[in-house]
């Protein structure tokens, strides 16, 4: 994520995409003063859960790495270096009026009215020449804005850098795991949840 302004990640379920992303967000906020990081998810509770993961990571950092916290609540963390991390549900006004340096959109293929949200959010992104965007999601059919951005990234027609995490990239997942998962669900469900199939 560090070398790319726009990153999009297509990843299978339970592959660590969210936890890896929020670890990067914490690093960014700690080591880049006076930055605002926004975590937006399809539900406010999900965004809050990611902020809770960041709080837990923060508590487990070695003492010499722990930044001072000026404020810590269920929706935001403010650090002594004047950086902050905020969390909210994806809605048209969730970050309106804010200056965002890093925007993280989690499970973006599952956001209702995502195209409308993205349209209303893009001015915040484009207002800063260095604003970073990280989008992660499991596939959720074709035609949605996540699918369109992903396909554009793969084809090289937009500025997003595509990253993909397949089921076999996850430690402990092998052909036996795949066969067992399909027998307990279905091929269609496997393809949707783990196969990165649109």
Identify the function of each model-found stretch:
Residues 1-198:
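Phosphate/NTP-binding elements of NTP-utilizing enzymes
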């Amino acid at each position: 994520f560090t070398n790319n302004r726009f990153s999009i990640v297509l990843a299978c379920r339970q592959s660590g995409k969210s936890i890896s992303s929020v670890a990067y967000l914490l690093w960014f906020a700690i080591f880049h003063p006076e930055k605002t990081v926004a975590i937006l998810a399809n539900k406010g509770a999900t965004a809050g859960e990611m902020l809770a993961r960041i709080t837990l990571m923060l508590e487990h950092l070695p003492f010499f790495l722990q930044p001072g916290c000026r404020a810590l609540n269920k929706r935001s963390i403010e650090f002594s270096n004047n950086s902050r991390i905020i969390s909210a549900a994806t809605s048209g006004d969730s970050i309106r009026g804010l200056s965002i340096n890093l925007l993280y959109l989690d499970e973006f293929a599952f956001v209702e009215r995502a195209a409308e949200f993205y349209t209303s959010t893009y001015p915040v992104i484009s207002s800063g020449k260095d604003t970073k965007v990280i989008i992660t999601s499991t596939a959720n059919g074709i035609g949605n804005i996540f699918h369109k951005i992903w396909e554009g990234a793969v084809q090289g027609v937009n500025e997003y850098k595509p990253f993909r995490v397949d089921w076999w990239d996850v430690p402990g997942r092998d052909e036996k795991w795949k066969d067992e998962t399909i027998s307990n669900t279905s091929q269609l469900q496997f393809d949707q949840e783990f196969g990165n199939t649109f």
